[in-house]
Amino acid sequence: MRILVVSTVYNSTPPVGYGGIQRVVHSLTEALVRQGHEVILMAPPRSSCSGRTVHVPAYDPERPWSAVKGEGDLLSEEPLYEAMREFLDSERVDVIHDWSFQSLFVRRHPQHTPFVVSTCIPPGPGFERTNLVASGEAHARLIGGTTRHVHYGLPLRDWKFEIRKSEPPIHIAKIARFKAQHLAILASMRARRPLVVAGNVENERYFNFVVRPLLWLAPQVRYIGEIAGTQEALLRASALIQTPRWFDCFPLVVLEALASATPVIALAEGGLPEQVKHGVTGFLCHDVASLAEAMSRIGEIDPRACRADAQARFSDEAMARAYVELYQRALAGERW
C-alpha cells in the first residue's frame, strides 16, 4: 500500500523537544515501513522517516505554538494545503493519513483520494469529522458519531526499562495551568515525599505566581526544566505523576512510563482511566489527598506489570496493524 502520512506543521517529525504527537506519527511511519508498506511522510524541515520524506513549510517560528494557542488563527495550514495539492497533482497514493489540525485538503477534496484523519484533541466545529480516528475510547465518545479509535503505540523493542527504581516520582508536562503541576507539588508536601518536576514553561504567569512559590515552600520538590527525552527520565523514576485539569485525551507520556516499567499516579481525567489499570499499573486519583496517598503506596505496584501491559496494549506494531485495517476500509469506499 502506498500511504501519504501528513504530520503537523508546528514541529518536526520526530520532534525537537516537546512533541508527543510527532513521536506517535514517527513510530507509525517506521512500523508501516517494517510491515512492507511504501510510506511518504509530509512534514516540516528536519523531519525524516525510513520511507520517503517530503518537506513542507513549517509554521511561522516567530509565532510559536505557546504564543498563539487559543487564537482564531491558531495554525495557518494553507501552505500545507498547497504542498499537498501540488504533490497529489503529480503523484498517486492509495490513501492519505492526515494528522494535521485543519485537514484542509481532505475537507476541500473529499473524493480525491481515500483518507483517514487522526486527531489528538477534541475537534472544534470546523474540523473534519469524516473517517475520523480518536486516540482512545473516551476520546471517541467525546467526539461522538461513528468516530473510531486506535491507541498510540511505542517502539517497545528499542525501549529500555528498569525493574529496580531508585529515583523519586517525576511529573513530566509543559508548565501550564491545565497540566496543574501545583497539585502534584501539594500532594508531595502532604505525603512528605520527594518529587521531580520536568517541563518547558508555556504559561509564565502560572509558573511565576503559582508553581515557583510552592517550590520555595517545598524543598523536597526539584524543578529541572525541559528534558530532551523521556526515556532516561522515566527509566528509574519510582512513578510518573500526571495531574491534568482538562480532558487529556491519551497522553503519550503515560505509555512511555508503562514501557519503562514505571507505575503511573494520575488524576482520573480524559483517557487516563483507559491507560492506567488502578491498583495494577498505578493509581487513579481524584484530589490532592488521594494523590498523596498513592505516592505513599507506590511500592505496592509491580513494575513488571507495567511493562507487560505496555507490551500487550501499546506497541507500534499493533498501532500500525489497526491503522492498516482502517486504510483498507477507506480504500473499499467505507465512510464512518
Task: Set out the residue ranges of the language-model regions.
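Nucleotide-activated donor-binding/catalytic signature segment of Leloir-type glycosyltransferases, i.e.
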Residues: 199, 208-227
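C-terminal "capping" alpha-helix adjacent to the active site of nucleotide-linked donor transferases
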Residues: 283-304
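Conserved donor-binding/catalytic core segment of Leloir-type glycosyltransferases
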Residues: 144-198
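Acidic donor-binding loop of glycosyltransferase active sites
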Residues: 235-249, 262
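Short acidic/histidine- and often glycine-rich active-site loop of Leloir-type glycosyltransferases
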Residues: 268-279, 283-286
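Short hydrophobic beta-strand element within catalytic cores of glycosyltransferases
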Residues: 259, 263-266, 276
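Donor nucleotide-sugar binding/catalytic pocket of nucleotide-sugar-dependent glycosyltransferases
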Residues: 116-160, 164-168, 222
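A charged, aromatic-enriched C-terminal amphipathic alpha-helix characteristic of glycosyltransferases
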Residues: 35, 74-79, 299-336
